[in-house]
Amino acid sequence: MERITVNLGERSYPISIGAGLFANPALLSLSAKQKVVIVTNHTVAPLYAPAIISLLDHIGCQHALLELPDGEQYKTLETFNTVMSFLLEHNYSRDVVVIALGGGVIGDLVGFAAACYQRGVDFIQIPTTLLSQVDSSVGGKTAVNHPLGKNMIGAFYQPKAVVIDTDCLTTLPAREFAAGMAEVIKYGIIYDSAFFDWLEAQMEALYALDEQALTYAIARCCQIKAEVVAQDEKESGIRALLNLGHTFGHAIEAHMGYGNWLHGEAVSAGTVMAAKTAQLQGLIDASQFERILAILKKAHLPVRTPENMTFADFMQHMMRDKKVLAGELRLVLPTSIGTSAVVKGVPEAVIAQAIEYCRTV
């Protein structure tokens, strides 16, 4: 088992990574008679809720289960209100612990509910998808979507612990696994060239669900995320680099309708557009762009601009991005394999050229 700490002073917390962790009650750091609410979705509940309930029974916790519908289209204020109503109707007090059992949608939504309920209650992240294991469960970003933009309503609120059981990946659909790989590859591009090299060599092992390879990849991603969050919890600086491909990607998700493109799929296509923008700006060379394009293709991810999405469509959504300051668009762009920067003042003509180029890659 790998163990990583997110260092945030009194709000520091552990990330536990490995196979068979759902058999280890100590990782939840709960005590007997504690009240716990597991929030999950209809897909994950039959797969993993019984194991978590068994753990809670072993500890002696009082527990309840809330199942929500599955999908990005349910990451809304309406579903958030369902969680809040459940907590209120059952008269839970501030000592309740909420467990987010599921992928990124569940983690973001439940974390936001925990941040808001009685001004904040403890919650534990138990991510069951690759994307949530390597990215969204770590760092305290919680939110729901709005029709005008993704993750526009939310809070920074850190979990009490993150428990990542790699066995969950054995039930993950291939499309969801590939979507998670987009975020894994992102870490190599923005932060760690040696990890990028390793991913190029180990892609087949990862897709074969090799336990050693998966544990290493997830741990390295969480390590990078923990280092970045410890330096910049609320994204005023270096943490923005974790959004490589997300400005273009969020525009795709919003325009195409939440749930039609998986988040990781949109990030993949967005990463190619960002990399092409970087090349056109002279930040990376053609060979580096081709390596980024090739590894995303190797991971079975979409790399092309959506056919029915114009430059104007992109700009309409991108100008609502949270990195826009004083009306100026800022993009996260690679400056090499393993380094990146937030760049402002990129001419719209260059962005348009990158979007058009990526229609035929």
From Swiss-Prot:
SUPFAM superfamilies: Dehydroquinate synthase-like
Listed CDD domains: DHQS
Top enzyme class: lyase
Keyword Zinc listed: yes
BP GO annotations: amino acid biosynthetic process; aromatic amino acid family biosynthetic process; chorismate biosynthetic process
Keywords per UniProt: Amino-acid biosynthesis, Aromatic amino acid biosynthesis, Cobalt, Cytoplasm, Lyase, Metal-binding, NAD, Nucleotide-binding, Zinc
Chain sites annotated for binding Zn(2+): 183, 246, 263
Highest taxon listed in the record's lineage: Bacteria
Pathway: Metabolic intermediate biosynthesis; chorismate biosynthesis; chorismate from D-erythrose 4-phosphate and phosphoenolpyruvate: step 2/7
Gene Ontology molecular functions: 3-dehydroquinate synthase activity; metal ion binding; nucleotide binding
InterPro entries the record matches: Dehydroquinate_synthase (IPR050071), DHQ_synth_AroB (IPR016037), DHQ_synth_fam (IPR030963), DHQS/DOIS_N (IPR030960), DHQS_C (IPR056179)
Catalytic activity field: 7-phospho-2-dehydro-3-deoxy-D-arabino-heptonate = 3-dehydroquinate + phosphate
EC number(s) stated in the UniProt entry for this protein: 4.2.3.4
HAMAP family the UniProt entry points to: DHQ_synthase (MF_00110)
Biological role stated in the UniProt entry: Catalyzes the conversion of 3-deoxy-D-arabino-heptulosonate 7-phosphate (DAHP) to dehydroquinate (DHQ).
Protein's UniProt name: 3-dehydroquinate synthase
Recorded name of the encoding gene: aroB
